[in-house]
């Protein structure tokens, strides 16, 4: 009976992960919207954001919304390199409401989570983890948002994990940010996302199976 129950749990979890899709096709900005006057363009298969004449905040947001997902991407910071990856966020002009995983120069909390126009910094990485950032080289970031829980990784190292009810209720898309101030240039590539479906149903089914197991053992 125990072996059967374990198999059922594994099957339940396996159907929750959908096929990985490319959010950036390496050729153009199809599927994305430019917000603000900063520069967003494609060059040699890379997505580039660069400060424009207004030196203001700018965002490139997905047209589609994503709730539960695993997002992987690569970024390379040139010049100042102050940027970020927003999730479950909505953008109107240069006003974004939602949550940002920080992408910043050394000692400025890359991998931490910030709530825009709300509570501000929710969690910052341990300063010792700053060593994992490779300024001026390609870095790999992974963000897993599943219900109330968000976990971030930088170059294979877990940076932070937070459980937050407000984040769990958030709705919106993915957005890349370029910070205000001018002199910023960041490159992006290999932006891939897997949607995580049936999050609640999966765990409810596991609870039911556990209940069945407890009933059968007494």
Segments predicted by a language model, with ranges:
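Short, intrinsically disordered C-terminal tails of secreted or membrane-associated proteins
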Residues: 214-217
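Sec-dependent N-terminal signal peptides
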Residues: 4-13
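Carbohydrate-interacting regions of secretory-pathway proteins
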Residues: 19-209
């Amino acid at each position: 009976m125990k072996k059967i129950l374990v198999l059922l749990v594994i099957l339940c979890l396996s159907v929750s992960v959908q096929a990985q899709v490319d959010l950036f096709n390496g050729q153009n900005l199809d599927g994305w919207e430019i917000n603000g006057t900063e520069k967003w363009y494609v060059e040699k298969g890379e997505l580039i954001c660069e400060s424009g004449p207004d030196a203001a905040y700018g965002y490139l947001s997905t047209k589609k919304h994503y709730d539960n997902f695993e997002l992987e991407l690569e970024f390379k910071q040139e010049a100042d390199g102050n940027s970020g990856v927003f999730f479950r966020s909505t953008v109107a002009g240069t006003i974004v409401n939602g949550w940002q995983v920080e992408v910043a120069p050394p000692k400025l909390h890359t991998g931490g989570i910030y709530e825009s126009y709300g509570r501000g910094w929710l969690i910052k990485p341990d300063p010792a983890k700053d060593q994992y950032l490779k300024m001026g080289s390609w870095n790999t970031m992974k963000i897993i948002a599943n219900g109330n829980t968000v976990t971030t990784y930088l170059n294979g190292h877990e940076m932070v994990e937070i459980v937050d009810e407000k984040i769990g209720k958030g709705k919106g898309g993915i957005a890349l940010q370029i910070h205000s101030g001018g002199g910023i240039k960041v490159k992006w590539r290999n932006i891939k996302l897997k949607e995580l479906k049936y999050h609640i149903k999966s765990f409810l089914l596991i609870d039911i199976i556990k209940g069945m197991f407890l009933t059968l053992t007494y």
